[in-house]
Amino acid sequence: MAIKTMTNNSGGGTWSEGWHQLTIEAAEYGDWNGTNFIELWFEGYPKTFKLRVYEAHNKETHEEFALAKLFKLANAGIIDKVKSPSGKEAIQYDDDASGLVGKQINGYFYKDGEYVRVSDRIAPVAHQGNVLSYTEDDVHFWKGVTEKHIASRKQNAPAVADTTSNGSEANVPF
């Protein structure tokens, strides 16, 4: 026998469910069956833990919005605010994936079977920027959007049958 030590975690570590402030360590574009995506890796986490955000387009305007929202909420590649042809305010940004590196986001970790994953719905980090700024209220709003999405996914997930038994047949060896 020997004297040993072990960690004494209280459940609030780097893998606990909930919100985590993440720093993007690497980002690159990819393609899956003709759909573009950006994959993100984070400082302090293994390369096997990543976030993949797929492009999505508005059915009426055909404008891509999912990757654009990633750049906007990460405050990455933001150049300026401009007026769109329709007169609405628009954000001009550079979509080079390297612009995401070093940026901080709030990511929501959730349990998916045996694994922890990060939601593709992120929230910004409160900060004052040259073009875009996010307040604590903005962060709270985007976190609420994500939490509502996660709750909806859990509610719509197929039910898993409970195969445990507490009856007398539980002691039958066959």
Label each region the model flagged.
Residues 1-174:
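Short beta-rich binding modules
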